[in-house]
Each structure stands twice: as C-alpha cells, then as structure tokens.
Amino acid sequence: MKTNQNLRFYWRKTHNKLMLGLSYISVIIGLFWLCWILFTLITKGIPALSIDLFTQSTPAPNEKGGLLNALIGSFFIVGAGTLIGTPIGVLAGTYLAEYGRYSRFAQITRFLNDILLSAPSIIIGLFVYSLYVSKIEHFSGWAGAFALALLLIPIVVRTTDNMLLLVPNNLREAAAALGCSQWQVIMMICYRAAKSGILTGVLLAVARISGETAPLLFTALSNQFLSWNMNEPIANLPVVIYQYAASPFTDWNNLAWAGAALITLFVLCLNIFTRLFFQHKK
C-alpha cells in the first residue's frame, strides 16, 4: 500500500517538475524573441534618431530628411479615428451592459463584436477601400481614420461592457431608490465607477491602432509632402516605415528604423502610463 502511494507521489512530483520545466522553457523562448526584436530596434533605431526627424519631411533617395509629414499625418489619422470610434464604442458597450444585458440581441452583438475584434486589419482596410475609397476614386486621410476607427470600436465596446458589468447592482438600486432615471444612474453612478477601466481600454486601443499599416495601405496611402488636408492621401508613419524598410536606399532604411523606434516608444509610454494610471485609480 505504501509502495503504491510512494509511486503515485513520485509520479505527481515528477509530472509537476516536468510541466514546470516546460513552462519555464516556453517563457524563455518567448522572452528571447522579444528581447531580440527590442535589441535590434534599439541598436538600429535609436542611433538614427535626430532633430531632423521632427523638422524635415520625408526626403528623396540619397538626400537628408525627416519624418515630420508622417508624424503629423499619423497624429491626424489616429486622432480622427479615436474621436470617431470612442463615442460609438462607449455607447455600444453601455447599451450591452445597461440595457441589453443578457438579452438575445445583446449576446448576438457581443459575438459579432468579438468576430470584428479578431478580424485581420487588412480585411478592414479592404472593406473601407471598397466602401469609400473606390467610390471617391482617390485615397483619403478620412478613409484611413474610418478604418482605424473600425479597429478601435470593438476594443472599446468590449472594455466598456466589461467595466460596467463590474459595477455593483447595489449602486444602481440605491440611485434608483432616490428617484434617478436609468440614464442618470448610468451617467452619474456607473460611468464614474467604471471611468478608469473605460479610459484604460481607450488608451490601449489607441496604442494598438497607432502601428497599423495594412488598413492605411488601402485607404490613406501616403505622400512625400507636408499635408494638412485629410481629403487627400496623407503621409503616415506606419506606411512610410513599410515603404522605406523595403527600399534599397540606406538613408531610407535608417529613417524606417527611426520611425519604428518612435512608434515603439510611443506605444511603450502609453502602456506604462495606462497601467500606472489604472493602478493609481485603484
């Protein structure tokens, strides 16, 4: 009897060590590739950073220049996409959590939202191209903003839905007992309780769409000039990085690495700020 118990204990102990070892190996493999990517980005991107990046537009081959037009274009496109997508996402998430809750329509909407959340970004770009760009017969900054908004909306919907569902029903019932309407309860109670989580979701969504390239290839494309007109093709950092990284010109390659470093630093800082802000609010 004791022999069988010892064997079972030995097998469980061995099995535990084996699985723990495999887990460590998996973590090491994942961190290895991440560290390699970051190391390559730092060694090639950081040395390429200079003041010219922020004062000059993208140059012709073998000439000095910067990424000013691409930075401004990305700011406009990402900003417009955020302004378009955030209200839609928050309102849709509010309906799912406060009005639809567990209704069949809400469940179907959540399912469709999850599909859109996992859809490849290039599919979104093709959709906007066929719906908008092909109709106006030219690329447009607004088309790029619309494509990024479609990528941002499902993230904000899911975050808003989850955060509002975490608000205790006792708060809603107490407000209703004081004579508040449902919309007043949502605005004054639920939003205040969930605002940190909703803001976190919005910031993480902005971090995600900031580096998207595929949708912009089919919508905003790019140009070589400093442009403020969102009705025309407008330069943006992801597409410039894609074009310059694939070019045979060394100066363009260096600008691509510098642009990649800028996007990475922006996303990193935004994620750090989001986590610190969220922890502080807790």
From Swiss-Prot:
Residues 71-274 form the ABC transmembrane type-1 domain. Keywords: Cell inner membrane, Cell membrane, Membrane, Phosphate transport, Transmembrane, Transmembrane helix, Transport. It comes from the Bacteria. The chain crosses the membrane at residues 22-42, 71-91, 111-131, 136-156, 198-218, 254-274. It is a multi-pass membrane protein. It is found in: Cell inner membrane. Belongs to the binding-protein-dependent transport system permease family. CysTW subfamily. NCBIfam families: 3a0107s02c (TIGR00974). This is Phosphate transport system permease protein PstA. It comes from Haemophilus influenzae (strain ATCC 51907 / DSM 11121 / KW20 / Rd). The lineage of its organism: Bacteria, Pseudomonadati, Pseudomonadota, Gammaproteobacteria, Pasteurellales.
